[in-house]
């Protein structure tokens, strides 16, 4: 993986509803955690195919300071409802923090255009890597 230079400070993750945790502040954890931010939608087939990798990375690297946060930015209106999102998280076995980004505020702040997209934020709060789509899992882990 070729890391980007430290030019882009990661925007804070704000949202309508948080699941599996209280709101996560990257600023409060600066110097402690590397963040993997997964932009996804539970109704997106490509996003569902990435979940085993995201969950595996969380399991393998959380003790080394990796913090995974899902940003659920729905494509369809039916995906906006908190109860529906909560049910999807339970059915998919997602236990890491997820924020509902119904108005695409976080999506736009990061300049995301495609589902799924993974963003790696270093311990200093800079965006160092961004990856779109279903491929490149092994590259991402290097």
Q: Residue spans of the language-model regions?
A:
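Loop/turn elements at helix/coil->beta-strand transitions in domains of secreted/extracellular proteins
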Residues: 31-35, 64-67, 93-96, 123
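Tryptophan-centric aromatic hotspots in well-structured domains and transmembrane helices
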Residues: 18-23, 40, 57, 72, ...
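Short active-site neighborhood of thiol/selenol oxidoreductases, capturing the structured segment around
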Residues: 25-48, 54, 68
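Structural microenvironment flanking redox-active thiols in thiol-disulfide oxidoreductases
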Residues: 48-92, 102-108
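N-terminal "domain-start" segment that seeds a small globular fold
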Residues: 1-28
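Proline-centered helix-kink/hinge sites
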Residues: 11, 45-46, 52-56, 63, ...
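Conserved Rossmann-like nucleotide-binding pocket used by diverse enzymes
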Residues: 9, 35, 40, 67-69, ...
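Thiol/disulfide oxidoreductase modules built on the thioredoxin-like
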Residues: 90-96, 100-142
């Amino acid at each position: 993986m070729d890391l980007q230079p430290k030019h882009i400070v990661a925007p804070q993750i704000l949202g309508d509803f948080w699941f599996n945790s209280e709101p996560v502040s990257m600023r409060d954890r600066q110097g402690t955690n590397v963040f993997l931010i997964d932009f996804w939608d539970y109704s997106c087939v490509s996003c569902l195919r990435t979940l085993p990798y995201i969950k595996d990375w969380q399991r393998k690297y959380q003790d080394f300071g990796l913090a995974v946060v899902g940003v659920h930015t729905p494509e369809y209106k039916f995906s906006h409802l908190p109860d529906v999102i909560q049910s999807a998280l339970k059915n998919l076995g997602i236990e890491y923090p997820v924020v509902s980004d119904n108005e695409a505020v976080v999506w736009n702040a990061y300049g995301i255009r495609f589902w799924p997209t993974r963003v790696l934020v270093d311990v200093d709060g800079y965006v160092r890597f961004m990856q779109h789509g279903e491929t490149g899992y092994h590259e991402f882990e290097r």
